[in-house]
Swiss-Prot record:
Signal peptide range: none
Gene Ontology cellular component terms for the protein in this record: cytoplasm; mitochondrion
Protein name (Swiss-Prot/TrEMBL): A-kinase anchor protein SPHKAP
PKA-RII subunit binding domain: annotated segments: 829-846
Domain of life: Eukaryota
Gene giving rise to this polypeptide: sphkap
Length: 1596
């Protein structure tokens, strides 16, 4: 929780402040801000006065504030320093009000006013425009107008909502990160010192903004600490006696002038000396702060007095006891003052749960030691108390007068003060005694600054009598090491001494002895309680546990499981407690699992719960009977709870032991730990387990000497072991039944425990079943044998970690399958459908090709069902690797079934045309229907399954809808989608029934893509053109090797994102010809086994032959009849994946209703090779999209996937396939083809067929969501006949130069789906585009003769503009074509270098390829933009490339035409000006701030808010802020345009400074001269020019 700073009263030299007017005073506001309460304690320093303010924000959050008092003894205060400062002036930029810069925002609020009326509505409104809480906060604190040398730093501001739309106070979309409240030195400072003073204020504000940026979100909690001048709060002050601090207020304090003052408790001195070393380090850390803020004279004095190191055992003086008593008295006074002030406040009084009270003596004691300990606890920040305005005089402080009267009269003072100011609200029901409140306050001090390690010591001390205090302190000094814990213990003893003094000296008083004694004992007990559980400041200690029962229970259960399985290696008990504490707090602050008494659970969980409860109830009744009916016997509820807990503990123990055994099987020794719980009970069992597991480990490791029998026996042993334990588990469960009052945490626990075991056993059964069936089958893979392990994430869903027995890795490879990381259902669904296009091509090759070379990669006979549900899960990579190993070892690999030759299949299909149709349409023949399993209509089934998939349906099981006469077959059960689609190895697909008599069955799209097996090995090693295709080739080889193991057709295998490469190659090949024939080179393919090239070659041969056949008249009739038999059946809906994958021989106007989203993997290439032959499809019956989920990743855009499909084919070909084909001589080199490419007349039938085939294939790849366009979208996109589309297809395929003839083909259709994201990378035309986006290249842009064509993300739907040199088109998306085509802005030169589309690392290294997709301009929908990853460098670069890129959306900007014309005027001078000062205009184009990589991390946006604008000189302030930012090294400083009324003049000043290469010193000198002139002119009564006018006039 970010901590905020605010200031209370000023330090004006009153006696209260001891005359230290130059001293910094820090006021911190520790806020407990949760959804349950919003209260704030404001406390100050120097005297123990507090003020409490209730921060009543409706948003439930709070400010934090720090007050600083500037002084003039630092190097930054000398004018010489500034005049000689030769640092470079930073850049200045301007932002539109609607633009969210993404960089830290600092708001400077100037409180200068002509009137002191704080209740003026205008003032309140202006303050609220910065933060809604600011006016109330200032008013409730009663803050007077700060002095010139006082500033307030605010952070954690809430965004303004009320004034956001007020045109007179335009605000940024998000609130400022830091706000600095100050009063300026009048309208214009006259002295150089005043100018420097203002600069220092801006320095502090800008530096705070930088700090908040540097530490990220965590800095919110540390910002207060960083902003504080640690050299002031030196550590020696931590243990000052109360008299030394309070004594400054009263010279008549007898103890202060006592010569025994030096004889303080030795332990305190020694502790102080021990901390002296830390002080120097902290001062060194804080040297930057101390340049701006002075150090305290008091702390310097203390440094001289007490920094002598006192090592060894010091001698304890005889006066220790007496001085300890004095010390205790003074401490008691300060604590009682604190209590008294609390009681006398008008605001609601101290609430024990919400507020953290700290007295001034100990106020500094926490910061530095906490930092030194580097404890991971985030303790509440300590608050320093400062006096309010109404107690400026000494006489108003009764405790000072009392102090002069009696040293030890704490009780009397307490009563006197209590009588003078009766409490308004008491924390307890009855009026609390002041001493009790004081002790409670002291206890909260101790609880605040301690850690759990101290609890034990405090517990020991609480048992001792307070008379032993001196001995205890002496024993403290014996330790030799004076840690923070010992200091706290000393403080607790001192607090105990308070009670001792009161008890001894006030015994004759009205105060009751018993009360005193119990209060002193209560102090230590409260201290113990508060140290035992120090909560984060964001959680109130009084928060009810009720709402978080499930979260806390879940955390504790996970920790117990982790302890059992030895997964967490805790270094010590303290480490364990600390970690658990953090997790519990995290579970409370971020509750993910709402607590519900009646939570829906599955039947299995309910049965186990009932069984356990029944069993426990029986046991409890027996124990109740044994106890007897005596009145002292506990009720049955206690017995029942005890039994249930014991039972659950045993279950958890047994299960955890199993998990632990499995996870330990890779370790060197599998010895059980003697100390672990339940070890002896399961010792024999573990021994057997270790035996089987060691053999299992042996079988996993890549060994040269094991055969199938050994593998089989090892797996059987493991199965027997797990089965034995399963039986034990079931035996316990079978004895129980009904559940009535078992709470949810137990249900959750048991659910997880037992589900794991059942899963294990079923998986092993599946493995053994397959081992029986196939002698040469591979080891169980990740999908078929997951050994699920629990892994806790506090308060979240459990992650399943799958341990896959993978032979390639030789170890148990952990695969995380986290539902949070897995893709959204829409993404998965789209990725499934995206691969339909390639399956069409492979079907054709499979069905219609002669297999001349004798290879049989495609088909095998039907293999019948398999016993286990996972029987068909045989991932290609693992299986192929094992099979290759066996072959190397001489093991014979025998195929059970000889696959039929392709010629046989072709003959069958010719004999039975219905078989052909069935094969072509097989995707929709069997699907999942979760609602109506009895439905037999495959189309309805498929539609409902797709709908369920999109609507985020959980785990899908594939229902077998085959006819009753058929042999049963198993289907895949795919639990989750693989996280990110990174791997290209997937599950194989079940077999196809080749028997024509039966209904064909296939797999629904819910199960096509499986888990990724080898995250690292399956990812492209480099983002080169070849790697994508190489990977696909490897996968195809592995897959086809697997085909002989009980699978039917390859055509059900879907290869994911890279699958369309074969089709793209085919389309490209079809579009190019040489002498009327396709170029197929067969000589180099003879030696290749089944690979991508040979498959494609066969496909080409088929197409050649088919085209020749089609060209002859005699075959036309037959072909037409055949294709007409494949027309879509009437009940088919747009959810159909495809109706035909044969090259279209139908009439040219017949349209497919295929809707398949293509997931783009090279969007940047699309924008480069723009063409206008996008094809639209309008299905006859479209489905309403209102109920469907939207994809967050913006990968699919409604109505635009047609062109994405089209462009994907272009780009996949040019980026990856083409070079590989040329390398392998499958297609001719471009040099041989180049002349023929343009002659489209020699063989019209070839050209015709190629165009038609390509157009239909693209048309068939339409997005499913493409049919659900808005009515307006459909209206503005004219329908183009298929023939025209095919014509356009021809042009774009035949021209590789980039200036395609087809570009203008569809220019007239302006889409309402155009994107606001502007293409920013200038590119030269390349034949094969790079995959990653390049940085801007100004040279290329300026050398273009006719202008560069601007490529938008969806450029084929947008009007192209060519507007002079290097222009970029900035469009606000709309369906208004006039707006789109009317404006083009010419950015100055400085923008182009800065404005990169993506992070620098992905551009320069090329190891990660990224594309960026902008969302459509649709106000009703989420318009967020994101980056997708195309290919990774080494399998782990997913975050490295993305790191600095801003993933926020690119906002839409309206066009500011007057600014454009201004900028055009100055374009020439800016382009030539390469000096240090560059003006950046970020109004219409996407700003470099949001995407500029590392440089944006330090840029700052400055807002200025003036209560009365007349009171401040805006130009002078802008110049001083410019100087401050340059001094800090900020690369760029941004202002809001509306806040700078003198925008034009500032532009000219920036130009001037750039031309003259001004440095900071030059600008400062000019400002100083101007202020001096201003003073002279004012005295003479002459008119005063403005700063910018004067600079432009005199400095040219």
């Amino acid at each position: 929780m970010p901590l905020l700073f605010f200031a209370l009263a000023g330090c004006d030299g009153s006696p209260l402040c001891g005359g230290l007017s130059q001293r910094n005073q820090f006021v911190r506001l520790a806020c407990s801000v949760t959804n349950f309460q919003s209260s704030a304690m404001f406390e100050g320093s120097e005297s123990a006065n507090t003020q409490e303010v209730k921060s009543e924000s409706t948003l439930g959050s709070s400010l934090s504030a720090c007050k600083k008092v500037l002084c003039s003894n630092s190097v930054l205060d000398s004018s010489e320093y500034w005049l000689k400062n030769d640092k470079t002036l930073c850049r200045i930029g301007f932002l539109e009000d609607q633009h969210d810069s993404g960089c830290p925002t600092i708001c400077f609020v100037n409180l200068d006013r002509h009137t002191s009326d704080w209740h003026d509505d205008n003032y309140i409104k202006k303050l609220a425009s910065v933060c809604p809480e600011l006016p109330r906060l200032i008013e409730s604190l009663g803050v007077r107008q700060p002095k010139e040398n006082e500033i307030l730093l605010l952070s954690s501001l809430e965004p303004p909502d009320s004034c956001q739309h007020d045109p007179s106070h335009p605000q940024s979309p998000r609130t400022a990160d830091v706000c600095l409240v100050h009063c300026s030195c009048g309208r214009r400072p006259t002295q150089t010192s005043s100018i420097i003073f203002e600069i220092n204020k801006f320095l502090i504000g800008l530096q705070s903004g930088q700090e908040r940026q540097k530490h990220g979100r965590l800095a919110g909690q540390r910002a207060a600490e960083d902003d504080t001048n640690r050299s002031v709060s030196s550590i020696e002050e931590d243990f000052l006696t109360a008299s030394e601090q309070l004594g400054e207020d009263s010279e008549e304090d007898p103890f202060r002038n006592d010569p025994e003052n030096s004889l303080m408790p030795e332990s305190v001195k020694v502790l102080r000396a021990a901390h002296a070393q830390k002080r120097s380090e902290i001062e060194r850390e804080d040297s930057e702060d101390s340049e701006t803020l002075c150090t305290s004279s008091n702390s310097q004095k203390l440094s001289r007095t007490y920094s002598a190191p006192a090592r060894g055992r010091p001698t304890t003086p005889k006066q220790v006891k007496e001085s300890a008593g004095h010390y205790a008295t003074n401490l008691a006074e300060s604590v009682l003052q604190d209590a008294f002030i609390r009681l006398s406040q008008d605001e609601p009084s101290f609430v024990a749960e919400a507020a953290v009270s700290v007295s001034s003596d100990i106020s500094h004691s926490t910061e530095a030691p906490q930092r030194a300990r580097a404890c991971s606890f985030e303790l509440p920040k300590i608050v320093i108390v400062q006096s309010p305005d109404n107690s400026e005089e000494v006489t108003e402080w009764p405790e000072v007068q009392s102090h002069a009267t009696s040293e030890h009269d704490s009780g009397n003072k307490a009563k006197a003060k209590h009588g003078t100011h009766p409490p308004h609200n008491s924390p307890v029901g009855h009026p609390a005694k002041p001493l009790e409140i004081a002790l409670a306050c002291a206890a909260s001090v101790i609880g605040t600054i301690t850690t759990p390690q101290v609890t034990e010591q405090l517990t020991l001390e609480s048992g001792e009598e307070y008379e032993c205090e001196d001995e205890e302190e002496e024993s403290e000094t014996d330790q030799g090491e004076y840690s923070f814990s010992s200091a706290v213990c000393g403080m607790s003893q001192v607090a105990g001494a308070v009670a001792a003094v009161d008890l001894a000296d006030d015994s004759g008083d009205n105060e009751d002895l018993a009360d005193m004694y119990s209060a002193s004992m209560g102090l230590l007990s409260v201290a113990q309680a508060s140290t035992a559980i120090p909560l984060h400041c964001s959680i109130a200690e009084g928060t009810s546990v009720e709402a978080f029962r499930a979260n806390v229970a879940e955390v504790l259960l996970r920790e117990a499981s982790a302890v059992f399985t030895h997964r967490q290696s805790y270094s010590s008990v303290a480490n364990f407690l600390e970690t658990t504490h953090n997790k519990i707090v995290d579970g409370i602050t971020n509750p993910r699992r709402p607590y519900q008494e009646q939570q829906d659970v599955d039947n299995f969980t309910q049965e186990i719960s009932d069984s356990i409860f029944q069993y426990a109830l029986e046991k409890a009744e027996k124990r109740k009977e044994l106890e007897g009916p005596g009145k002292d016997a506990p009720n049955i509820e206690g017995f029942l709870s005890d039994c249930v807990n014991n039972l659950l503990f045993d279950v958890l123990c047994v299960t955890s032991r199993k998990i632990s055994d499995i996870s330990n099987c890779n370790m060197e020794s599998c010895d059980g730990q003697e100390g672990s719980v339940g070890y002896r009970a399961y010792e024999a069992d573990s021994k057997a387990g270790r035996e089987a597991l060691s053999q299992l480990q042996h079988l996993i490791e890549p060994s040269q000497a094991y055969n199938h029998g050994e593998r089989r026996s090892s797996v059987e042993k493991l199965s027997a072991l797990i089965g034995k334990r399963e039986r034990e588990q079931k035996h316990i469960q079978e004895e129980r039944e009904n559940e009535a009052r078992l709470k949810e945490p137990y249900r959750l626990a048991l659910n997880r425990v037992t589900a794991t075991m059942v899963k294990e056993q079923s998986d092993l059964q599946g493995q053994l079943g397959r081992s029986d069936k196939n002698a040469d089958s591979a080891l169980p893979s990740a999908e078929s044998s997951p050994l699920h392990m629990q892994r806790g994430r506090a308060g979240g869903e459990s992650e399943t970690r799958q341990q896959s027995l993978s032979s390639s890795s030789g170890a148990l490879v952990a695969l995380k399958m986290d539902s949070g990381e897995s893709k959204t259902p829409v993404t998965c669904f789209a990725e499934d459908l995206a691969t339909t296009v390639v399956s069409m091509a492979t079907e054709l090759a499979a069905i219609c090709l002669e297999n001349s070379s004798g290879k049989q990669p495609w088909f095998c006979a039907l293999n019948g069902g398999s016993e286990g549900p996972e029987g068909l899960l045989l991932p290609c990579r693992t299986a192929a690797a094992l099979r290759r190993k066996e072959t190397q070892n001489g093991t014979s690999v025998t195929k059970k079934h000889r696959p039929p030759r392709l010629s046989e299949i072709k003959r069958k299909t010719e004999e039975q045309p219905e078989l052909m149709e069935r094969l072509v349409n097989r995707v929709v023949d069997e699907t999942v229907n979760l609602d109506e399993p009895t439905t037999t209509d495959p189309f309805a089934l498929f539609a409902s399954e797709v709908t369920a998939r999109i609507m985020n349906c959980p785990e899908l099981s594939v229902v077998d809808t085959s006819k009753s006469g058929q042999s049963s077959r198993s289907r895949l059960q795919c639990e989750r989608w693989s996280s990110r689609g990174k791997a290209s190895s997937y599950e194989s697909i079940p077999e196809e029934d080749a028997d024509p008599s039966g209904t064909s069955n296939t797999l629904g799209p819910g199960n096509r893509l499986g888990h990724n097996l080898s995250r690292g090995s399956s990812i492209s090693k480099q983002s080169s053109c070849e790697s994508i295709t190489d990977e696909f080739s490897r996968f195809m080889v592995n897959q086809m090797e697997t085909e002989g193991r009980g699978f039917d057709l390859l055509l059900d295998y879907y290869a994911g994102k890279n699958a369309s490469s074969i089709l793209a190659a085919a389309v490209q090949q079809a579009a190019s010809k040489k002498n009327g024939h396709l170029n197929v080179r067969t000589s180099s393919c003879l030696s290749k086994q089944s690979s991508t090239e040979s498959i494609t070659e066969e496909f080409y041969r088929f197409m050649l032959k088919d085209m020749d056949k089609e060209n002859k008249d005699y075959s036309m009739t037959k072909t037409k009849e055949w294709s007409n038999s494949l027309l879509p059946p009437s009940p088919r809906t747009p959810f159909c994946i495809r109706q035909s994958s044969v090259p279209d021989r139908r009439s040219s106007d017949s349209r497919l209703t295929v809707n398949s989203p293509i997931k783009a993997n090279s969007f940047d290439g699309f924008a480069q090779n723009v063409h206008g032959d996008s094809l639209n499809i309008y299905p006859t019956n479209s489905v309403s999209s209102s109920g469907l989920c939207k994809s967050d990743s913006c990968l699919y855009k409604r109505g635009q996937t047609d062109q994405i499909t089209d462009m994907l084919i272009h780009e996949t070909w040019s980026s990856s396939i083409e070079s590989l084909m040329r390398k392998n001589k499958i297609i001719a080199e471009p040099s041989e083809d180049s002349l023929e490419l343009d002659s489209a007349d020699s063989q019209p039938h070839v050209q015709q067929f190629a165009n038609r085939l390509a157009a239909d294939i693209v048309e068939s790849g339409k997005s499913q969501l493409g049919g659900q366009q808005d009515v307006t979208a459909a209206a503005c996109q004219p329908h183009i006949p298929v023939g025209e589309r095919r014509h356009g297809f021809k042009h774009s395929r035949c021209n590789n130069s980039g200036n395609r003839p087809g570009v203008e083909h569809q220019e007239n259709s302006c889409s309402s789906y155009s994107s606001s994201c502007v293409r920013q990378a200038w590119r030269g035309q390349r034949e094969v585009p790079l995959i990653h986006i390049e940085p801007d290249q100004r040279e290329e842009a300026s050398e273009e003769k006719g202008g560069v064509e601007t490529h938008h993300r969806e450029a084929s739907h947008q009007t192209q503009q060519q507007s002079g040199k290097g222009s970029e088109t900035a469009t606000k998306s709309s369906s208004d074509s006039d707006r789109v085509s009317s404006v083009a802005t010419v950015p100055p030169a400085g923008v182009e270098v800065e404005r990169r589309s993506l992070s620098a690392s992905s551009e320069e290294s090329g190891s990660g390829s990224w594309a960026q997709i902008a969302t459509e301009d649709d106000p009703q929908e989420e318009t967020t933009s994101s980056f997708i990853q195309l290919s990774e460098g080494n399998g782990n670069s997913s975050t490295s490339s993305l790191g600095l890129a801003d993933l926020e959306g690119f906002p839409d900007f309206s066009i500011s035409s007057n600014l454009i014309s201004e900028e055009r005027e100055r374009k020439t001078s800016h382009c030539q000006d390469q000096a240090d000062v560059t003006l950046v205009v970020l109004s219409e184009v996407t700003s470099g701030l949001s995407t500029a990589g590392s440089s944006c991390q330090r840029e700052l946006l400055v807002l200025n808010c003036d209560l009365e604008p007349d009171c401040v000189d805006g130009e002078l302030r802008a110049a001083l802020q410019w100087i401050s930012a340059s001094e800090l090294g900020v690369p760029a400083l941004y202002f809001r345009k509306t806040h700078q009324h003198n925008l034009t003049k500032l532009h000219r000043v920036l130009q001037l400074a750039g031309q003259k290469a001004w440095r900071v010193g030059d600008l400062f000198s000019a400002v100083a001269q101007f202020c001096q002139l201003h003073q002279d002119l004012e005295l003479k009564g002459r008119p005063l020019p403005s700063l910018f006018d004067w600079i432009l006039k005199t400095k040219r």
